[in-house]
């Protein structure tokens, strides 16, 4: 019979639903059961799990909702004691409690649930032998408890649980994410305290068991129960390599402030010695950034010298301003070759030291930059080292003048310098450059035309020049261009789907007058890598020291296939070629293209998204006059943004004697197993540049990876490549943590399309 009950009872009875508690009778749902639920109630079960903990029958919580209580028998004494027995059911939307016997003293607020009880919510389920508590103090205690947590699909047990406000104290409790009937790993603690206000828990006398065998013991530990951060030990990283042997580090996380944290990692490398890596991350009103520093003391394979690396990166936006810094330092040229850091810069020849600020206005943009480099390639001569920009100031804008006529403004002033130890004899000094233009773009639905006229002026004030050289040279020239294009489209139906096909021819006529620039210094100019887009540029050089004379007509054709239902570009085809009316007179010292050619190679590319997760990209460059291939690239890839990644590539540059193939993949071969591999092969020299092979096993409670990597490296800087092999191991206890986190960084760098969040 329905019986009203004071609403105050409910918060205490349901306190534990925030702490959550279950096994097969704790709402474990396998795939067959999930399929029987209505579609709106079904939840995804990960491929590697047989099921999840989930209960769709209790609904979602509703604040202030009525409570319905039923029981076979009920009595109310004159003292205000309510007694219920026989199939007692207490229900609210999102919550449900069942028990055999329930008592509530309305005068004191004490209550008891006896002869077994079960509490269910939309977040958890728990079963206990009995429960007692106090509604006014919002506290309760349970004995003989089993529980399940839906968010993490975890389960456990406890001899005793005490609930008060938003805290939970568990005595002699266990925790695991393994499926029912499996105890791959179990964390066991004498006392576990959970504070949901702070988002963290503490455990005393903690034992981690694997297959019921104790693996390690900790007298005390803290751990997160939500996404908030907390200081403590992270799991170690581990690898074994040919050159250094065993490499192990133990990260220690420090949550210093809501906007400041740090990680300190003592490190031991068997063949080299001990060291320390550290990183600090911060957030401020100026943006976000990180500071990192690493040191290896008395490296036994490097004349017992200390070896160091440091880096500062920062990115931020303030109103219309953006700020960026990237400063890197290493103590020696071979640091990145000998010691893996996980940094993407480890393969660079010149390490950046950059600080810049940009202002983005509606019409005008301002750039201020300081830039230098640390070169870590000992084979480079001083003459090959890049210039420093100390500083660079730039102003650009596109003000509207009259009607469709707009002005384009570019002005740049840069002070170029070199290191104090440089003995190349190259000039240094100040360069000012201006390139104002007038342009008028006329456009409608079927095409456009855009004439443009530009003036170029460059002025130098040089510091170190020979006596017979001018210290204030300058350059003035002009250019004009006409860019035009048409848009055609037609409807079509291919493979049962409706598409819109476009045809977009483009003509670009460009004229830049010749001025002798052989006596001018060259601080930062060079030839552009030839590509489809480079054919439609006004200046064929990058930088401002060289203005490339030319009279050229570039012809391009683009065709796209757009899916009418989704608007997705299913296929894009492009082809272009340039034709010269005059030989080019302005060249750089390292010119690649012949300035007397009367036409460029034909270049084309294609990207075909031929299925939801598949794409194919191909690019080719063909010299018509010589009837030979100059460059070709091919890549086909698959990425379902979950567990499968496949890449197959081929790269061919005959002029540079480069012909390489690449295959990489992460493929499931079973519900629990994935194969991981990468192979880069030098077809000309018939040698493997890099091989990586490994496997991953994953179920509800484990993720294990074992990888073997072999790559050719120039360890001595003499140009001779030698093989270096490393074995990587990663283990993660799902919902608890693991070690070997550098494996994720390795896969992100090595396998295009892999992202650790997909796992």
UniProtKB/Swiss-Prot annotation:
Residues 1-22 form the signal peptide. InterPro entries: LipoPS_assembly_LptD (IPR020889), LptD (IPR050218), LptD_C (IPR007543). It comes from the Bacteria. The keyword Membrane applies. It is found in: Cell outer membrane. Keywords: Cell outer membrane, Membrane, Signal. One of its GO terms (cellular component) is transporter complex. GO terms for biological process: Gram-negative-bacterium-type cell outer membrane assembly; lipopolysaccharide transport. Belongs to the LptD family. Together with LptE, is involved in the assembly of lipopolysaccharide (LPS) at the surface of the outer membrane. Component of the lipopolysaccharide transport and assembly complex. Interacts with LptE and LptA. HAMAP family: LPS_assembly_LptD. This is LPS-assembly protein LptD. It comes from Alcanivorax borkumensis (strain ATCC 700651 / DSM 11573 / NCIMB 13689 / SK2).
């Amino acid at each position: 019979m329905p019986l009203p009950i004071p609403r105050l009872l409910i918060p205490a009875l349901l306190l534990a639903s925030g702490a959550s508690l279950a096994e097969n009778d704790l709402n474990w749902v396998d795939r067959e059961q999930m399929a029987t639920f209505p579609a709106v109630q079904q939840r995804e079960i990960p491929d590697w799990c047989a099921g999840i903990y989930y209960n769709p029958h209790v609904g979602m919580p509703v604040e202030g909702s009525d409570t319905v209580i039923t029981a076979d028998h009920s009595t109310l004494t004159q003292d205000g004691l309510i007694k219920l027995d026989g199939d007692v059911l207490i229900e609210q939307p999102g919550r449900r409690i069942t028990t055999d016997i329930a008592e509530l003293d309305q005068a004191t607020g004490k209550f008891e649930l006896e002869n077994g009880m079960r509490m269910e919510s939309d977040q958890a389920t728990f079963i206990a032998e009995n429960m007692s508590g106090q509604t006014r103090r919002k506290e309760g205690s349970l004995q003989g408890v089993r529980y399940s947590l839906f968010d993490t699909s975890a389960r456990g047990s406890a001899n005793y649980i005490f609930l008060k406000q938003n805290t939970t104290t568990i005595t002699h409790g266990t925790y695991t994410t393994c499926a029912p009937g499996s105890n791959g790993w179990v964390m066991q603690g004498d006392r576990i305290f959970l504070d949901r206000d702070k988002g963290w828990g503490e455990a005393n006398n903690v034992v981690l068991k694997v297959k019921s065998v104790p693996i390690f013991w900790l007298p005390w530990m803290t751990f997160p129960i939500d996404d908030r951060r907390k200081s403590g030990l992270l799991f170690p990283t581990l690898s074994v390599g040919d050159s250094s042997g065993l490499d192990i580090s133990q990260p220690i996380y420090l949550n210093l402030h809501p906007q400041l944290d740090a990680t300190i990692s003592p490190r031991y490398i068997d063949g080299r010695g001990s060291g320390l890596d550290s990183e600090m991350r911060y957030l401020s009103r100026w943006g976000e950034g990180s500071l990192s520093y690493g040191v290896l003391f008395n490296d036994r394979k490097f004349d017992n010298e200390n070896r160091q690396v440091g880096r500062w990166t920062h990115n931020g936006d303030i109103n219309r301003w953006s700020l960026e810094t990237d400063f890197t330092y290493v103590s020696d040229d071979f640091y990145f070759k000998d010691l893996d850091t996980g940094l993407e810069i480890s393969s660079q020849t010149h390490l950046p030291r950059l600080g810049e600020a940009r202002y983005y206005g509606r019409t005008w943009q301002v750039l201020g930059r300081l830039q230098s480099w640390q070169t870590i390639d000992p084979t480079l001569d001083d003459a090959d080292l890049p210039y420093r920009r100390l500083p660079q100031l730039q102003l650009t804008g596109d003000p509207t003048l009259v009607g469709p006529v707009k002005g384009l403004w570019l002005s740049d002033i840069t002070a170029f310098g070199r290191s104090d130890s440089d003995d190349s004899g190259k000039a240094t000094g100040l360069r000012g450059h201006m390139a104002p233009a007038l342009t008028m773009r006329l456009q409608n639905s079927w095409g456009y035309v855009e004439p443009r006229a530009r003036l170029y002026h460059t002025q130098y004030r040089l510091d170190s020049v020979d006596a017979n050289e001018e210290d204030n040279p300058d350059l003035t020239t002009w250019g004009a261009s006409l860019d035009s294009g048409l848009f055609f489209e037609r409807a079509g139906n291919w493979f049962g789907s409706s598409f819109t096909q476009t045809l977009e021819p483009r003509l670009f006529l460009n004229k830049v007058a010749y001025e002798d620039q052989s006596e001018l210094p060259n601080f930062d100019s060079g030839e552009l890598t030839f590509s489809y887009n480079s054919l439609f540029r006004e200046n064929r050089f990058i930088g401002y020291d060289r203005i490339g004379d030319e009279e050229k007509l570039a012809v391009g054709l683009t065709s796209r296939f757009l899916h009418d239902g989704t608007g997705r570009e299913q296929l894009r085809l492009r082809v272009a070629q340039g034709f010269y009316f005059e030989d080019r007179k302005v060249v750089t010292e390292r010119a690649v293209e012949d300035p007397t050619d009367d036409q460029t190679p034909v270049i084309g590319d294609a990207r075909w998204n031929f299925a939801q997760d598949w794409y194919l990209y191909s690019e080719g460059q063909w010299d018509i006059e010589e009837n030979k291939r100059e460059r070709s690239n091919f890549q086909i890839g698959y990425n379902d943004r979950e567990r499968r990644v496949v890449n197959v590539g081929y790269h061919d540059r005959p002029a540079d004697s480069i012909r390489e193939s690449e295959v990489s993949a992460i493929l499931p071969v079973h519900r629990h197993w994935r194969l991981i591999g990468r192979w880069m092969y030098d077809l000309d020299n018939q040698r493997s540049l890099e091989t990586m092979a490994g496997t991953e096993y994953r179920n509800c409670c484990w993720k294990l990876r074992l990888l073997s990597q072999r790559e050719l490296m120039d360890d001595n800087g003499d140009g001779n490549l030698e093989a270096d092999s490393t074995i990587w191991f990663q283990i993660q206890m799902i919902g608890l943590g693991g070690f070997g986190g550098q494996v994720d960084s390795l896969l992100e760098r090595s396998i295009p399309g892999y992202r650790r969040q997909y796992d």
